């Protein structure tokens, strides 16, 4: 294991200083070592670890310390947002590293202004649903102010709402 990784995960390392209640987990350190070696050797790696192992930091720490560009794909938007808004900035600060990150999402995650205009103008894109017109009006008000068009900004609108295609 690279001594930098070992130091990061130790009882008095940067993670312990940055995270109240931090506890050293040998499994986490072992996973970080495996990830670090795979990154250094440019080899693929598949890792399985149980709940509470600390998988997120075990792959993020070696990725950040490698200095390489790394792509991290998540299974859920919730984890994606957690990494982008919380975990990566926290680790960058704890490790004293400048971190450049970008959040990439597919086009289904963004407002289509053309479809919104059609729905508002014709109403034909909306199935029969009580309250759909109010919901559409709310989306239209949001669309007038959003800078990104990221549908995640509409936190009070369920992903299963009938107004989404």
Would you name each region that the model predicts?
Residues 29, 54-57:
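Non-catalytic, well-ordered alpha-helical scaffold segments
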Residues 47, 60, 104:
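Hydrophobic residues at beta-strand termini and immediately following loops
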Residues 51:
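The conserved Walker
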Residues 33, 64, 109:
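Residue-level marker of positions within ordered structural domains that often coincide
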Residues 2-47:
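Conserved pre-motif I regulatory segment
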Residues 36-40, 56-69, 86-90:
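Walker A/P-loop NTP-binding motif
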Residues 46-48, 71-72:
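Short, conserved beta-strand segments within well-ordered enzyme catalytic domains
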Residues 2-18, 69-165:
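A substrate-engagement module of RecA-like helicase motors
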């Amino acid at each position: 294991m690279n001594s930098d990784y070992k130091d990061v995960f130790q009882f008095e390392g940067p993670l312990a200083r940055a995270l109240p209640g931090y506890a050293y987990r040998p499994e986490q350190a072992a996973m970080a070592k495996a990830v670090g070696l795979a990154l250094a050797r440019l080899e693929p790696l598949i890792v399985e670890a149980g709940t509470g192992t600390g998988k997120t930091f075990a792959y993020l720490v070696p990725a950040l310390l490698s200095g390489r560009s790394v792509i991290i794909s998540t299974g859920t938007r919730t984890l994606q947002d957690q990494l982008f808004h919380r975990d990566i900035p926290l680790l960058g600060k704890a490790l004293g590293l400048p971190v450049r990150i970008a959040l990439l999402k597919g086009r289904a995650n963004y407002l289509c202004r053309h479809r919104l205009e059609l729905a508002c103008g014709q109403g034909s894109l909306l199935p029969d649903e009580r309250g759909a017109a109010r919901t559409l009006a709310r989306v239209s008000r949001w669309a007038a102010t959003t800078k990104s068009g990221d549908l995640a900004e509409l936190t009070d609108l369920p992903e299963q709402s009938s107004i989404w295609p």
